[in-house]
A protein has these predicted regions:
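Active-site acidic short loop of glycosyltransferases
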Residues: 15-21, 43, 158-159, 185
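Conserved hydrolase catalytic core segment
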Residues: 20-64
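Conserved donor sugar-nucleotide recognition element shared by glycan-biosynthetic enzymes
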Residues: 2-10, 172, 199
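Conserved loop-alpha-helix segment in the C-terminal half of the alpha/beta-hydrolase fold
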Residues: 151-194
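Alpha/beta-hydrolase
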Residues: 70-159
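Catalytic active-site module of serine/aspartate enzymes centered on a nucleophile-bearing elbow/loop
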Residues: 185-222
């Protein structure tokens, strides 16, 4: 679970599907993958780039998460501080605190009958790739992506770029604006009252934005 492996998987997928021209959308970690791919592998055929609730700096991301933690209850703040200091992320107090944090900035519990079946049906999940790649939670990057810092390289991106984020997102307005300020001629759309999955909380507006963006940036040759 390293950036090189994931980029090579993307390269292999494009080759296998013969995707000579694409609009590349990266959501969350996928945006980091897209940035790594574009900045370090010189791909061709990228019509436009869509960076959805993502980041260009792991250190800024962690700093912003800790800033938001300071708005939580003292009990939750204390539980998170103890977990980070001791490395014990299994205590009941920490699990409750982290759940509260994720509900505030990522996603809540989906109710059966009020959400698509794909979100509510039982599923097997694993943590190994997330733990190895990022860390124990969103605000403690310790994995293979902990050193992801490409903000200073964003000036080299010369393709149309759309940045999407929510006001209550893990991708805070500062994280999103940092990318917007460093990618020339980029467009930034900030969705009010949305967390880390804007596409799920403002679905119609998100789809309309993408449709407009794709139409605007579709190559004439097609």
């Amino acid at each position: 679970w390293t950036p090189e492996t994931w980029v090579n998987e993307l390269i292999a997928l494009r080759k296998h599907l013969n995707l000579t021209k694409v609009h590349l959308l990266g959501q969350s970690w996928g945006g980091m993958l897209a940035l790594d791919y574009i900045l370090h592998y010189s791909p061709t055929g990228i019509e436009s780039l869509i960076l959805s609730s993502t980041l260009s700096s792991a250190s800024l991301w962690a700093s912003e998460q800790h800033r938001m933690i300071r708005f939580m209850s003292e009990v939750d703040q204390r539980a998170i501080e103890i977990a980070e200091r001791t490395g014990n992320y299994e205590s009941e107090d920490y699990i409750i605190a982290n759940t509260n944090f994720m509900h505030a900035h990522c996603a809540g519990v989906y109710e059966i009958g009020k959400a698509p079946d794909c979100l509510t049906r039982p599923k097997k999940t694993g943590k190994e790739a997330y733990l190895y790649g990022w860390g124990p939670n969103e605000y403690t990057p310790t994995g293979s992506l902990a050193g992801f810092e490409v903000t200073d390289e964003l000036k080299h991106i010369d393709i149309p770029t759309l940045i999407i984020s929510g006001t209550n997102d893990l991708c805070t307005p500062l994280v999103a604006k940092t990318m917007h300020d460093n990618i020339k001629h980029s467009t930034w759309k900030l969705f009010p009252n949305c967390r880390h999955m804007v596409f799920a909380e403002a679905t119609n507006q998100y789809i309309q934005l993408l449709q407009s963006w794709l139409k605007q940036n579709e190559s004439v040759s097609r």
